A protein has these predicted regions:
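Short, Lys/Arg-enriched N-terminal segments with co-localized hydrophobic residues
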Residues: 1-20
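Structural signature of tandem-repeat unit edges
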Residues: 5, 21-32, 40-56, 66-79, ...
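Consensus positions within tandem repeat domains that build extended binding/scaffold surfaces
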Residues: 36, 60-61, 82-84, 104-107, ...
Length: 182
């Protein structure tokens, strides 16, 4: 006997600036912008709905969601929180929005992708951004990149190439990894 149950898609419930829609809980941060505070799903392919004007993905939003293999982030997002994708070891595809201007520390820590292209508006990689990304081989920085802090690539033992402009200030400790022998 097989019994299955599918939860219906929940409508948006508003309560003092907090909304819930599908697998996401939003919090209003300004007049017309929202922060995604929680993810309660278990999908392999995650799409953050663009029906809300989301500008921030909050700290640890997808942390330890090992089931995630790809994620779509809407073009309204400007900030990615700390430890956002920590432990998403099966994450293979992520396309960052061109609107992205800010990352917090450890954003992609222990994620599973092999390559990432950073948007032009992103000017800085904070410490430990890609810490222990064991599969990471290639990073392409956008034209607006100005600073790569210490330990950004710490523990990225498969890292082969980081492409960035000639005027980027790079910490001497940014590439502490076996792959680049530094």
């Amino acid at each position: 006997l097989l019994i299955s149950y599918e939860e219906p898609i929940e409508p948006i419930i508003e309560n003092q600036g907090v909304k819930r829609m599908q697998d996401f809980i939003y919090s209003q941060i300004e007049d017309c912008t929202y922060c995604v505070m929680r993810y309660r799903g278990n999908e392999a392919e995650v799409v953050i709905p663009d029906s809300q004007n989301v500008t921030v993905l909050f700290d640890r939003l997808f942390a330890r969601h090992k089931e995630i293999t790809s994620i779509h982030i809407p073009d309204t997002v400007t900030d990615l929180g700390e430890l956002l994708f920590d432990g998403c070891e099966n994450l293979r595809h992520i396309e960052l929005p061109s609107s992205l201007t800010s990352l917090w520390g450890y954003t992609f820590c222990r994620s599973g992708f092999e390559e990432i292209v950073l948007p032009d508006k992103l000017a800085c990689l904070p410490p430990f951004t890609f810490k222990d990304c064991k599969n990471l081989k290639r990073v392409v920085c956008g034209s607006g990149m100005k600073k790569i802090h210490a330990w950004v690539f710490g523990g990225c033992d498969q890292l082969e190439e980081v492409v960035c402009g000639p005027n980027v200030e790079i910490s001497p400790d940014a590439y502490k990894t076996k792959a680049l022998n530094t």
